[in-house]
UniProtKB/Swiss-Prot annotation:
The gene is rimM. Belongs to the RimM family. It comes from Synechococcus sp. (strain WH7803). Its main location: cytoplasm. The PRC barrel domain binds ribosomal protein uS19. One of its GO terms (cellular component) is ribosome. SUPFAM superfamilies: PRC-barrel domain, Translation proteins. This is Ribosome maturation factor RimM.
Length: 175
């Protein structure tokens, strides 16, 4: 499988406790990827993804972080070896969406405009997931901006046409 055959859904960011549990920062809007048992894949930098069985998971109350347990990872030492790896699923394992919905990673590559007939003011290069999702926007001059992905600032997404509309507050584009 090539890199395009995989979809990153989270990053292992820390160990939780002494019995092999791990904290995962999600890059997916589908919590079942972290709570429903089944096959997942872990990818270390410079290596191919390797299959691992998710046995359980839960979201920490009031946080966007999940605590997961993988088969065969029974100690803190075993868990620490997985910190920094990316949790993956096959790219064709995307949940069905309702009309008007989209997968956040589909925003990468879209042009950002201030109006439907306006010129592109940048291109979405990445997405940072956390408490609030951020679009990483590359300007034509090479500068990079972080744009909060909230409806007030990104009211329209036109995947089929390859662009999204921004309504930034004063000063956001000058940062």
């Amino acid at each position: 499988m090539t890199a395009d055959d995989w979809l990153p859904v989270g990053k292992v960011v820390a160990v939780q406790g002494l019995k092999g549990e791990l904290r995962v920062n999600p890059a997916s809007d589908f919590p079942e990827r972290f709570t429903e048992p089944g096959s997942r894949w872990l990818k270390a930098r410079g290596q191919a993804p390797r299959e691992i069985e998710l046995t359980s998971g839960r979201q920490l109350p009031g946080k966007s972080v999940f605590v997961v347990r993988f088969a065969g990872v029974e100690s803190r030492d075993a868990a620490e070896a997985l910190v920094g790896q990316t949790l993956m699923v096959p790219a064709d394992d995307r949940p069905e969406l309702a009309e008007g919905e989209f997968h956040l990673l589909d925003l990468v590559g879209l042009e950002a405009r201030l109006s439907a007939d306006g010129d592109a003011i940048g291109t979405v290069k990445d997405l940072i997931s956390g408490g609030n999702d951020l679009l990483v926007l590359e300007r034509p001059d090479g500068r990079t901006l972080m744009i909060p992905f909230v409806e007030a600032i990104v009211p329209d997404v036109h995947l089929e046409q390859g662009w999204l509309r921004l309504t930034p507050p004063p000063g956001l584009l000058e940062l």
